[in-house]
Amino acid sequence: MSDKEQTSGNTDLENAPAGYYSSHDNDVNGVAEDERPSHDSLGKIYTGGDNNEYIYIGRQKFLKSDLYQAFGGTLNPGLAPAPVHKFANPAPLGLSAFALTTFVLSMFNARAQGITVPNVVVGCAMFYGGLVQLIAGIWEIALENTFGGTALCSYGGFWLSFAAIYIPWFGILEAYEDNESDLNNALGFYLLGWAIFTFGLTVCTMKSTVMFFLLFFLLALTFLLLSIGHFANRLGVTRAGGVLGVVVAFIAWYNAYAGVATKQNSYVLARPFPLPSTERVIF
């Protein structure tokens, strides 16, 4: 192998610096590969090897087959090495819990069938959207997926806190019993905070896939519409947020299905479509 290994045609790709460490640094005879030119290029992505079989991310080296691509089914927003721990993928469980609870509440917000009292969602929010999603998020952290763990644990906490609002034992609604205006403003700020948080996560998905990005972008808009609906006391805006929430629920189910369906168990697979900004990635 020459001192300058082959790189892709991407103009951002240059030769990687020396000092990489990987379990794949030695060939079958135990001979180390040639060192790469030493210049600073941390944070860039490179290809190397006779057939471009290696990926260099920062100062780490991986086989292409060892890397996870951006994929909604695993809640990985970008290239990531395979986790050290060997657990099943918890993302579909967390996404399913989020999707079903969002679907139920959003149908209530949209006033489907004339329903105005959302208390039926409390049980779902406590145990499926809350507890189960929180457990899935903790498992994501164990699998070294910071984004997935942050998202699932946070939205699990959202559903638990939302359920607490409608549980009389907490006394939250009772405190606003004589002041509906304060209740609407308080719920508006509550939902606005979640909108801001979700917009932050959306920025972290802009190099992933279309359905992955849409999940968080539309969810942020849903929170924003619901927040505005409470601030302005406009039922029409709240209903619009409910309709958009139903769309978000189906996108979450799609991403969950993408993480469950494989060639071994299904004839119908969910194909990831990368966003335009990721078409230059070297895979």
UniProtKB/Swiss-Prot annotation:
PROSITE patterns: GPR1_FUN34_YAAH. Keywords: Ammonia transport, Cell membrane, Ion transport, Meiosis, Membrane, Transmembrane, Transmembrane helix, Transport, Vacuole. Induction: During meiosis and by external ammonia. One of its GO terms (biological process) is ammonium transmembrane transport. Residues 1-41 are annotated as: Disordered. The keyword Phosphoprotein does not apply. PANTHER family: ACCUMULATION OF DYADS PROTEIN 2-RELATED. NCBIfam families: AceTr_1 (NF038013). Transporter protein required for ammonia export and acetate uptake and resistance. Necessary for up-regulation and down-regulation of meiotic plaque (MP) component levels in a dependency on external acetate. Has a role in ascus formation. This is Accumulation of dyads protein 2. It comes from Saccharomyces cerevisiae (strain ATCC 204508 / S288c) (Baker's yeast).
